[in-house]
Amino acid sequence: MNILIAIGGRDYSKPTLDLGMKIANSLEASTTIAYVGKKVSQFSEKDVSVVHQNLDERQLYRPGVRTLEWAYDFLKSKNYIQEETNDFNDHLLVDEENSRMRVLLKGKHSNKIDLILRTGEIIEQLRSEVQTNNHDITVIGGGKNKGMHHDLVQFIDSSVLVVKNYSFKKKYKVLLPVNNSVGSRNAIEIAE
């Protein structure tokens, strides 16, 4: 079972990350936590690589890394990751492909959790992440951009859970709407 948790800003993503990790933990699923940042234009790519080198020398972070650092700290605080070393740093980022970077994690449970930084259009990048890594469930926040959520539900090829108005203190029941589609059969298997 593979779960993708899409996060945005720190303030809005805490409920999404919390619920997504509770679900992933209960299903003992491999989990990818992804942040999608803005893509830099091709004309600026050389300048950006020079700037990234300068940022590394000055120990400053690339855009989006602070959000991943927040997610990393959140995972540690909830004991989803138990690291031998306590520091998150930019040197743990590994370029994997054009618009995807992964944070190397070490320690207990880290083989089942990936922190990913992608750049580009949100829907396109999340769709690519789901297709490339065969995610069964995508967890997204229920923010104010309703059109984007509609598009994500429509175009992402996995089950989608939208987290909106989630309270850490309240217990919830889940309504699982199904029909006779292949996706519904998978959802029923997962729920059982």
Feature roles, as predicted:
Residues 57, 109-113, 144-150, 175:
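Acidic/glycine-enriched edge-of-secondary-structure segments
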Residues 40-45, 95-99, 160-162:
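Short hydrophobic/aromatic-rich motifs at helix boundaries and adjacent loops
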Residues 1-66, 70-72, 76, 80-83, ...:
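Small/aliphatic-rich secondary-structure junction motif
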Residues 73-138, 144:
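Structural beta-alpha unit
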Residues 28, 45-49, 55-56, 89-96, ...:
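Short alpha-helical interface elements
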Residues 42, 93, 148, 170-171:
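Short secondary-structure boundary/hinge segments and terminal tails
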Residues 13, 17-19, 115-170:
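Gly/Ser-rich helix-loop-strand patches that form or flank binding pockets
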